[in-house]
Swiss-Prot record:
Origin superkingdom: Eukaryota
Protein's UniProt keywords contain Transcription regulation: yes
Identification of the protein by name: Mediator of RNA polymerase II transcription subunit 22
Places the protein is found: Nucleus
Disulfide bonds: none
Biological process annotations from GO: regulation of transcription by RNA polymerase II
Coiled coil: 93-123
Length: 201
């Protein structure tokens, strides 16, 4: 709690010192400028010679001009210190700037997310169409290979007449097997051992 109270007190003290510097520098500029104007006034002759008085006035004017320059530089340094104080200690403004930047970055992130989602959907649709095309062409080729040659050719070539394919197997008659007889052989009678047929008179 003491540290939290000390921080505002230090800020208040710093602001008071800035205010005092401002008033002192402005007063120094005004006083020195007023004295320069007074020095420029020609006075009556005194015990000091006019040449000596002129040199004295010239030196005084240089000193007061240097004081004005110093006060001006002090004011410029005060402006820089005030800017630094505001940048480092003006937390509401800093937080507001941070919030605005965060909102801009969130909006940019949402826009990028929307574009990425749209791109993903387009790629998914194109990939799905390519897969359908690929698998449909593959399945048609597989079905054609599983079918008989004539039917597969007929499916691949719609102009071909189906009757030609159906009549093609009938044109080639199957060859008989080498071991099986086509017809039953007639029985033969042997005349070597027995007598011939009886002749009637």
């Amino acid at each position: 709690m003491a540290q939290q109270r000390a921080l505002p007190q230090s800020k208040e003290t710093l602001l008071q010192s800035y205010n005092k510097r401002l008033k002192d520098d402005v007063k120094s500029i005004m006083d020195n400028f007023t004295e320069i104007i007074k020095t420029a006034k020609i006075e009556d002759e005194t015990q000091v010679s006019r040449a000596t008085q002129g040199e004295q006035d010239n030196y005084e004017m240089h000193v007061r001009a240097a004081n004005i320059v110093r006060a001006g530089e002090s004011l410029m340094k005060l402006v820089s210190d005030l800017k630094q104080f505001l940048i480092l200690n003006d937390f509401p403004s800093v937080n507001e700037a941070i919030d605005q930047r965060n909102q801009q970055l969130r909006a940019l992130q949402e826009e990028c997310d929307r574009k990425l989602i749209a791109l993903r959907d387009e790629v998914s649709i194109d990939l799905y169409e390519l897969e359908e095309e690929y698998y449909s062409s593959s399945s048609s080729l597989c079905e054609a290979n599983d079918l008989p040659l004539c039917e597969a050719y007929w499916r691949l070539d719609p102009d071909t007449d189906s009757t030609d394919c159906l009549s093609a197997p009938l044109l080639a008659s199957p060859e008989p097997s080498a071991g099986g007889p086509l017809q039953a052989a007639a029985p033969t009678h042997s005349h070597a051992g027995g007598p011939g047929p009886t002749e009637h008179a």
